């Protein structure tokens, strides 16, 4: 799997992104069960992983003075974390309707396969890049200039879709907590991480 002969370009996110912007607002006490679907940065750390199509939170759109939205295919980054390994955690939004995006989230628009980008941004190498130069403190921050420097492999859209299809199957096994003991689920998670890194390891950087 790793080292496969596939045409690939290694590109910075700054080269593939078509737009960047930050979310705004949506305090904890402004989250409700009704209203427009929304996402807060903490949910990227605790609730969503790789991709999601529905929000667990909503808010009253009319009460948000500064409105920022995400649409189908956007990549969302949490730019604040308490731990360096989790700084810049990202998730792809693949739902049909626009959602409101809270503060400490950066939205990246692009023309690639959103699931592929999210898998590529979760690899061991990408996580190390996100944390590069960060110093442990009570709260760790990153920003758009730093995110733009992250380098990931970009094969053809057809190859991106092929890789995503394989990883979706492995990833589904790690999230199905209804089957298997905790030890089995942990083994599946390690297997998924292994194949993810292998599939996203190409022979050489261009």
Model segments located where?
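Short, structured motif recognition centered on aromatic/hydrophobic residues
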Residues: 8-13, 36, 70, 74-76, ...
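A short beta-sheet element
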Residues: 40, 65-124
């Amino acid at each position: 799997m790793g080292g496969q002969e596939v045409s690939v370009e290694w590109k910075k996110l700054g080269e593939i992104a078509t737009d960047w912007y930050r979310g705004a607002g949506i305090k904890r006490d402004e989250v409700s069960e009704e209203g427009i679907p929304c996402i807060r940065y903490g949910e990227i750390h605790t609730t969503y992983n790789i991709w999601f199509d529905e929000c667990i939170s909503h808010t009253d759109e009319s009460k948000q003075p500064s409105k920022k939205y995400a649409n189908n295919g956007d990549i969302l980054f949490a730019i604040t974390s308490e731990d360096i390994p989790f700084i810049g955690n990202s998730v792809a939004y693949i739902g049909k309707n626009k959602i409101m995006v809270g503060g400490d989230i950066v939205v990246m628009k692009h023309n690639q396969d959103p699931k592929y980008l999210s898998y590529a941004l979760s690899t061991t190498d990408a996580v190390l890049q996100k944390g590069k130069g960060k110093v442990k403190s009570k709260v760790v921050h990153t920003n758009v200039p730093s995110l733009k420097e992250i380098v990931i492999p970009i094969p053809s859209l057809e190859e991106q879709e092929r890789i995503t299809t394989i990883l979706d199957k492995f990833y589904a096994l790690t999230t199905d907590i209804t089957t298997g003991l905790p030890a089995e689920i942990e083994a599946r998670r390690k297997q998924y991480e292994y194949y993810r890194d292998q599939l996203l390891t190409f022979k050489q950087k261009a």
